[in-house]
A protein has these predicted regions:
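Sec-dependent bacterial lipoprotein signal peptides
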Residues: 1-20
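Cross-family detector of peptidyl-prolyl cis-trans isomerase
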Residues: 5, 20-359
Length: 359
């Protein structure tokens, strides 16, 4: 704490001295520029700015594919402000260190897209040109935290700031220009995984068809796969306006369970909550003229469900149990869902059609 107060005092002293000198710039970032320059001096940052005016503190070159302006970057990162306060992160260790770890939350690399206007200018300046496997720690001044693109630092300095200065510590895990195919390929790798368990069986053993390993080409429709786990008691399709009851468990491709109606499963995966009722949920079986399954809803309040979940149900018959695996366009797309499902995440749902609860 003393070091922080001392640093702030030194910065204030430098700013006071600078106020007597001729102003280097004018405009909305005049004070920001003076403060930033003073902060660099107090913290002995002696590196020269590069690109638009970012300061690269550490850099390890990757050996994989180069990040360009037309794709999707999978990366781990930690961001902090100039005072050292962590403002965002992807890693589980950081969450644990901050006392913010939640078992059901997702921790790991996340996708951002690199298209023009989707990244802050300074962040894009740091990321574009990096290669998969590369690492960089960089300081990005507040005037470069803008989604607009200009040709020079002076043009950014003339704009109103949108965000404070940022220290960005990033590692590139992967890069693709074809995100849907990337997800489908990930599903294919999941089918062949020997370590992830599906109801106590390795995924590689579950996803077999007549003794042959399921492949990405075995989709029922693009990005959607279904595997029967228990045969139905009747192969007749459900009539319209039918109500059925199911138990389900939702997972990501790494085997992490994020939601379930089964109490034992919740406890086994350490996501149990005493505030939640673990019991079969009602499914309202209906259809629409356009896609057949779009009218399926959940609960007495007819809650809408994601397409992949509905499409899994659409494959099923009375008392059947099965597993649906699908890419994010049939799930939560680029936005993900809360803290448990990241953007561009394929999902797995194990669904068990059961008898109506007696109560």
């Amino acid at each position: 704490m003393k070091k922080i107060f001392l640093a702030l005092f030194c910065i204030a002293t430098i700013l006071s001295s600078a106020s007597c000198a001729k102003k280097a710039i004018e405009g909305p970032n005049e004070g920001n520029k003076r403060y930033f320059d003073a902060w660099l001096k107090v913290n002995n940052i002696n590196v020269e700015p590069s690109g638009l005016g970012i300061y690269v503190l550490e850099e390890t070159e990757g050996k994989g594919r180069e990040v360009t302006r037309d794709g999707f970057i999978l990366m781990d990162y930690v961001t902090s402000d100039l005072e050292g306060n962590i403002t965002s992160y992807t890693g589980v260790k950081t969450a644990q260190q901050l006392g913010e770890y939640v078992k059901s939350d997702y921790y790991g690399p996340q996708f951002v897209n690199s298209f023009e206007g989707s990244l802050y200018a300074g962040v894009a300046d740091a990321l574009i040109g990096m290669k998969v496997g590369g690492h960089k720690k960089v300081i990005i001044p507040t005037w470069l935290m803008s989604y607009k693109d200009y040709d020079s630092e002076s043009e950014y300095l003339a704009q109103e700031p949108e965000q404070g200065s940022l220290i960005y510590d990033v590692t590139i895990r992967d890069f693709t220009t074809e995100i849907n195919q990337w997800e489908i390929d990930s599903i294919g790798r999941f089918f062949a995984n020997r370590n992830i368990l599906i109801e106590d069986r390795p995924a590689v053993d579950v996803f077999m068809i007549d003794g042959v390993q399921m492949q990405p080409k075995d989709s029922i429709r693009t990005g959607f796969y279904y595997k029967q786990l228990r045969k139905p008691t009747d192969t007749t399709a459900f009539p319209l306006d039918t109500t059925i009851f199911i138990n389900y468990t939702g997972m990501t491709l790494d085997g992490r369970v994020f939601d379930t109606t089964v109490e034992k499963t919740a406890k086994d995966y350490d996501i149990y909550s005493a505030d939640k009722e673990y019991e079969p949920v009602q499914i309202n079986w209906s259809e629409t003229e356009d896609d057949g399954y779009g009218g399926i809803t959940m609960g007495t309040d007819d809650t809408e469900i994601i397409d992949g979940f509905a499409l899994t149900l659409w494959q099923m018959r009375a008392m059947e149990k099965g597993i649906g695996v699908f890419y994010s366009p049939l799930g939560y797309s680029y936005s993900g869902s809360g803290n448990s499902i990241p953007g561009y995440s394929p999902l797995i749902f194990i669904i068990d059609i059961v008898e109506k609860p007696e109560n």
